[in-house]
């Protein structure tokens, strides 16, 4: 097998080699059963065991309290932009949203289709380079919920604190930083995360929802989008994304073997410190994000001369450093350094960046 490249894609993102090797070994014959997980009935005892173990491992990793349901759903995080208000926003109610970038803005735009949305705070006055402190927020009394994105993958902003909303349920899009460090699940009413960054392959979204928030869906809510229906049917009201669920379970096993989210926090801190440290010491590369809002997972950076961007990307590709091009809406470069990428990937990137700077700086 040729050497594996370092994949810095924002999503679908790198998966651990050990997980892919395990899936490869089990592809044609899962544990002597003579068939692939792809071919299993989702109602079979074997597949139900796979699904239940994946859920339990995720519960263990995040210390999910017993009064929360863990759902493995379809449609990705973007479908949750509609599913959340359909389940949690009464027709005459108001939901508060915090806008810190493109993904939280998309959530706001979708929620407005279903009811009243109050944008309680926005990072726009800071040019999306910093997150407004909660003392700047204009929260609605008795809001149905407060929604925010803990990490903006495109802009590279991340909350390093959890908003305090009292009795109002806190809803968070953790698509790009879930499992990257410990969290207190009990601080949230609902957590959702598209799988294709830190959980597994695309086609799946994980929802962790407090039980008291179930059963309030609008009468017009499609059955497939009703959290209570999903919870009552073990996320199997219809055929789930079985292989994505299975692969996510392998990732959870790998995370536990690595020492859990506590070990991931140490690993991720070392990676982001190395990369941001190099950028800050350089006179050729820049990252403009406020230091206390810098993402641990998605590191955008620019070259001193954007005319060199194509040469930089070509050289990176030639060295097996893939998918470093920034999002089309912001340009520049972006290195996504999720759990599956180790420090050696960041060291390889920094080495190339130093070499390129020496040649072109």
From Swiss-Prot:
Its EC number is 2.6.1.52. Coiled coil: none annotated. It catalyses: O-phospho-L-serine + 2-oxoglutarate = 3-phosphooxypyruvate + L-glutamate; 4-(phosphooxy)-L-threonine + 2-oxoglutarate = (R)-3-hydroxy-2-oxo-4-phosphooxybutanoate + L-glutamate. Keywords: Amino-acid biosynthesis, Aminotransferase, Cytoplasm, Pyridoxal phosphate, Pyridoxine biosynthesis, Serine biosynthesis, Transferase. InterPro entries: Aminotrans_V_dom, Pser_aminoTfrase, PyrdxlP-dep_Trfase, PyrdxlP-dep_Trfase_major, PyrdxlP-dep_Trfase_small. Its cofactor is pyridoxal 5'-phosphate. Pyridoxal 5'-phosphate binds at residues 77-78, 103, 153, 173, 196, 238-239. Binds 1 pyridoxal phosphate per subunit. It is an enzyme of class 2 (transferase). L-glutamate binds at residue 43. HAMAP family: SerC_aminotrans_5. Catalyzes the reversible conversion of 3-phosphohydroxypyruvate to phosphoserine and of 3-hydroxy-2-oxo-4-phosphonooxybutanoate to phosphohydroxythreonine. NCBIfam families: PRK05355.1, serC_1. This is Phosphoserine aminotransferase. The lineage of its organism: Bacteria, Pseudomonadati, Pseudomonadota, Gammaproteobacteria, Pseudomonadales.
């Amino acid at each position: 097998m040729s050497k594996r490249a370092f994949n810095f894609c924002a999503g679908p993102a790198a998966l651990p080699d050990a997980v892919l090797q395990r899936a490869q070994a089990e592809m044609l014959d899962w544990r002597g059963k003579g068939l692939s997980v792809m071919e299993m009935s989702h109602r079979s005892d074997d597949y139900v065991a796979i699904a239940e173990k994946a859920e339990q491992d995720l519960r263990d990793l995040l210390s999910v309290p017993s009064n929360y349901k863990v759902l493995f759903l379809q449609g990705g995080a973007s479908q949750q932009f509609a599913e959340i208000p359909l389940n949690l926003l009464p027709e005459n109610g108001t939901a508060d949203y915090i806008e810190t970038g493109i993904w939280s803005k998309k959530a706001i735009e979708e929620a407005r289709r279903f009811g009243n949305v109050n944008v309680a705070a926005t990072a726009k006055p800071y040019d999306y380079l910093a997150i407004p402190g909660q003392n700047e927020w204009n929260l609605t009394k008795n809001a149905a919920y407060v929604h925010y994105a803990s990490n903006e993958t495109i802009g590279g902003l991340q909350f390093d604190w959890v908003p305090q909303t009292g009795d109002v349920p806190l809803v968070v899009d953790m698509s790009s930083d879930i499992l990257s460090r410990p969290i207190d699940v009990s601080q949230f009413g609902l957590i959702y995360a598209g799988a294709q960054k830190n959980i597994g392959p695309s086609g799946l979204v994980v929802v962790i929802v407090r039980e008291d928030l179930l059963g309030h869906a609008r009468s017009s809510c499609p059955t497939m989008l009703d959290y209570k229906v999903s919870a009552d049917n073990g996320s199997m009201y219809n055929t789930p994304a079985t292989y994505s669920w299975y692969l996510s379970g392998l990732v959870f096993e790998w995370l536990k073997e690595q020492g859990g989210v506590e070990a991931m926090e140490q690993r991720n801190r070392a990676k982001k410190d190395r990369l941001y440290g190099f950028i800050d010491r350089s006179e050729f590369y820049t990252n403009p994000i406020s230091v206390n809002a810098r993402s641990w997972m998605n590191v955008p950076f620019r070259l001193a001369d954007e005319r060199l961007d194509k040469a930089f990307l070509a050289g990176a590709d030639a060295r097996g450093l893939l998918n470093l091009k920034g999002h089309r809406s912001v340009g520049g470069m972006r290195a996504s350094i999720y759990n599956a990428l180790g420090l050696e990937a960041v060291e390889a990137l920094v080495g190339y960046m130093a070499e390129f700077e020496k040649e072109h700086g």
